[in-house]
């Protein structure tokens, strides 16, 4: 309220067709302005009539105002900020939102590396932040709105996600039990970051299923997930020599020179799943998109490993030859254990 007459002493606010009211005193400190909050009020539109009175009890002319009370119904339809990216940046995570110009900001809640839950407000003018979150841990964020003339901020429903694990580099670890290559599709293509090149075994070399390849990670890693990209160009997805069933193995010991499984631990058995469930040779757009995006798997036997081995047990087309384009491994890097003997 703003007022100029020093003789005003009190006032009354009416609403709900004068069924409800609130009396208030007008400050005598000469400030000429003050505010009054009516609470609680149910969500909705309101019309208000205000009377002021001087020290002799004479009323003013009625002043009429309108206003809106926001609440759960309004908050339930609030838009949430679009998350553009969550990326690993060295030992921290970079987060960026988009389409936030009409919003006040975002409240991000996450677990930091000390094990504490932190809440960070990110203003829409910034729309990005860097945090020391735990890889693989859950985060949530709400979007803060402040409608025009509102005295309070309103909060959207929370969006929940997980911070990604770190992608670990690796190379081929040469052993006599690694399946030979044909057609010039070398196993090094599995870790070159190029989805147009891959590894291809063949029946001509005498190789029969299962086929296997051994890898050394750049550093010991607590593995949590991996992704395999099958041959999905043109109409190759979910047919021919694309892997259908396979196992993943790990060890921290230097692999035996004969390439045997001694000292290795099976981390899990995995199977490629075609989204449509249609017979081999029949593809939907969703099948193709799924194959090209790569198939991700959680590793049930989580542990810290330096060496990995994949064994392909069955192909989609029932063929003995196997082909796929790329492998990616994700987890939490650990310090070196002293093993540094590469067989490249």
Predicted regions and their residues:
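An aromatic-rich alpha-helical recognition segment common to small helix-rich domains
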Residues: 1-2, 13, 38, 46-50, ...
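Low-complexity, Pro/Ser/Thr- and charge-rich linker/hinge segments at domain boundaries
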Residues: 70-89, 161-183, 334-344
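Hydrophobic core positions of the immunoglobulin-like beta-sandwich fold
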Residues: 38-39, 97, 130-131, 215, ...
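Conserved aromatic anchor
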Residues: 1-7, 91-102, 228
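Aromatic, loop-rich ligand-recognition surfaces of beta-strand-rich domains
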Residues: 194-261, 291-344
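Beta-strand-rich modules
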Residues: 38-62, 129-161
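Extracellular carbohydrate recognition and processing domains
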Residues: 262-298
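Recognizes extended acidic, P/S/T-rich segments that occur
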Residues: 10-44, 107-136, 268-270
């Amino acid at each position: 309220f703003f007022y100029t007459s020093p003789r005003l002493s009190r006032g009354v606010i009416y609403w709900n067709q004068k069924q409800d009211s609130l009396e208030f005193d007008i400050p005598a400190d000469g400030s000429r302005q003050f505010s009054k909050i009516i609470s609680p009020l149910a969500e909705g539109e309101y019309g208000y009539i205000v009377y002021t009175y001087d020290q002799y009890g004479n009323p003013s002319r009625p002043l009429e105002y309108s206003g809106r009370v926001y609440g759960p119904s309004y908050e339930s339809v609030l838009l949430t900020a679009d998350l553009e990216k969550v990326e690993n940046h060295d030992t921290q995570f970079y987060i960026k939102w988009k389409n936030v110009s009409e919003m006040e900001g975002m409240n991000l809640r996450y677990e930091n590396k000390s094990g504490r839950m932190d809440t960070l407000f990110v203003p829409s003018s910034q729309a990005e932040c860097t945090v020391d979150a735990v890889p693989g841990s859950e985060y949530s964020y709400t979007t803060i709105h402040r409608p025009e003339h509102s005295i309070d901020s309103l909060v959207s429903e929370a969006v929940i996600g997980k911070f990604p694990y770190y992608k670990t580099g690796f190379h081929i670890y040469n052993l006599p039990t690694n399946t030979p290559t044909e057609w010039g599709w070398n196993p090094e293509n599995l870790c070159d970051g190029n989805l147009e090149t891959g590894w291809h075994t063949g029946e001509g070399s005498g190789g029969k299923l299962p086929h296997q390849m051994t890898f050394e990670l750049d550093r010991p890693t607590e593995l949590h997930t991996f992704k395999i990209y099958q041959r999905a160009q043109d109409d190759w997805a979910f047919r021919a020599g694309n892997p259908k069933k396979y196992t993943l193995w790990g060890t921290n010991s230097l692999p035996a020179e004969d390439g045997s499984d001694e000292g290795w631990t099976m981390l899990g058995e995995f199977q490629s799943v075609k989204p449509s469930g249609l017979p081999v040779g029949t593809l939907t757009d969703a099948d193709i998109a799924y194959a090209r995006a790569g198939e991700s798997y959680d590793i049930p036997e989580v542990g810290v490993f330096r060496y990995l081995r994949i064994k392909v047990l069955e192909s989609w087309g029932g063929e003995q030859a196997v082909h796929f384009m790329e492998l990616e491994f994700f987890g939490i890097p650990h310090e070196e254990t002293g093993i540094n003997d590469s067989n490249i």
